[in-house]
Amino acid sequence: MISSDAERSRVVFRDGDASYEATINLPGGYNIYNACSTMACGKAVGLDLQVVSKSLSAFACGFGRMEKFEIDNVPLRMILIKNPAGCNQVLNFLTEMTEPFTFAVCLSDRTQDGRDISWIWDVDIERLVQMGDLLDHVLLSGNRADEMAIRFQYAGLPMEKLEVVRDYLDLTKACVARKKPCYIMPTYTAMLSLRSTISKHFGFKAFWE
């Protein structure tokens, strides 16, 4: 890896004596892992690795997968979660932040999300809480927001930093009102509802466009 920040990573892939530089237009270490897998698959099927690396540099995120919105000059990034492994990867990314940020979690237990939410106790929330003042505020939503609030309380988050916001439009406005970069971590159905709200009220394209 050459460099990495909250927007992208620059990496060099090596294959024997050959090297291929690419810009991964998504932050997070797990996106670098995905890019490595892409290069490996390309090599396995005999593709030109220079072409593969250039294609990686042209890649744009899918909806909800590190998708970025800017509202009133406040950047919001939506990061879909499905399980504790993926959630911990998101937290790994967040703990690299060097400026204060707002964090939002939208936890739902609809059929597409999975009914069992006990996995939130396998997520290293404590590591996030230990960031201190860098973790400026935590906003919670989704139909299981109360359980997520309990998880943060057990992790030691001061109560004054914790806020449950039931309505997704109110949640979006609360994220923007903090005037700091905001990272939103929704489960699948919460992501669809939240993204629809953002598109409708703030002029962004629907996810299928």
Where are the predicted features?
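Surface-exposed loop/turn and secondary-structure junction residues enriched for glycine/proline
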Residues: 5, 25-29, 33, 69, ...
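Extended acidic/charged loop-beta regions that coordinate divalent cations
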Residues: 1-21
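ATP-dependent carboxylate-amine ligase
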Residues: 43-49, 54-63, 68-209
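Generic structural motif
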Residues: 4, 16-18, 27-29, 83, ...
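A conserved, hydrophobic alpha-helical segment in the catalytic core
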Residues: 20-57
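Glycine/charged-rich beta-loop-alpha catalytic/anionic-binding loops adjacent to active sites
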Residues: 15-24, 69-74
